[in-house]
Amino acid sequence: MLASRWKLRPMEEKDLLLVLSWRNKPSIRSAMYTEHEISLEEHKLWFCKTQQKGYGGKHFIFCLDEHPLGVVNFTAISREHKRLNWGFYLGEEEAPRGSSSVMGFLALREAFENMQMHKVVGEVLENNEKSLRYHQRLGFLQEGCLKEHIFKEKEGYLDVVCFGYLSKQWEKIKQILLNELEEMD
C-alpha cells in the first residue's frame, strides 16, 4: 500500500498556488502561529527563501496516486544535533480516511530513515485537540509546555504543547504503525 500509492515528494514551484489555497483556509490558518491571510507575493518570497543555499528546511507535498493532498514541512534542521521541527496539514478536505496517518508515517520515515535524524520536534497550540491526539497516536511524547506563547486575536494568549520523537522510539513503533495502516487499506 505505502510503497506504490502514497508518497512524499519535494515541493516545487508548480505547487505554490495549491499550497497557498490550502494554507489560507481558515481551518488551517487557525492552527498556525501566524493566522493572517498570506498574499501570493508573500508566499512566493517564502518559497524563494526555501530554495537558497543554507536554508535549514525541507518541504514536501503528500500525494495519493500523484494527487496532492497535503504538506509536510521540516524546519530548523540541525545536522550537528540530528534534529528537526515538523509541521503538516492535509489541504484536501476529501482526502481518504486514514490519509493523515499515512502522511505522518511517511514524514517520520523520511526524517528518521532517509535523513538519519535523531529527534523530531512538534509544537501544537493548546486548543488544537485534533493535532494533540494525532501526535500522541503517532508515538510522540509530550516534553513540555510553553505558557502563553502565542497571541491570537480571538483567543488571547495560548500555550504551546511541545512534543518529541526519538529515533529509538521510531524503531520500536514503526512496525506497529505500518501494520495499522495496512489494516486500513
Could you tell me what each predicted segment is?
Residues M1-L18, W22, C63-D185:
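Acyl-donor (CoA/ACP) binding surface of acyl/acetyltransferases
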Residues E13-L20, L40, K44, C48:
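An amphipathic alpha-helix signature
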Residues C48-I61, G70:
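A short helix-loop-beta-strand connector motif used in the catalytic cores of GNAT acetyltransferases and
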Residues S27-F47:
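Conserved GNAT-fold acetyl-CoA-binding loop/helix
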Residues I38-E41, T50-Q52, L90-G91, E180:
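Juxtamembrane/interface motifs at transmembrane-helix termini
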Residues R29-A31, T50, E93, H149:
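Alpha-helix C-capping/helix-to-loop hinge sites
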Residues S30-M32, H59, I173:
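Short, hydrophobic secondary-structure boundary micro-motifs
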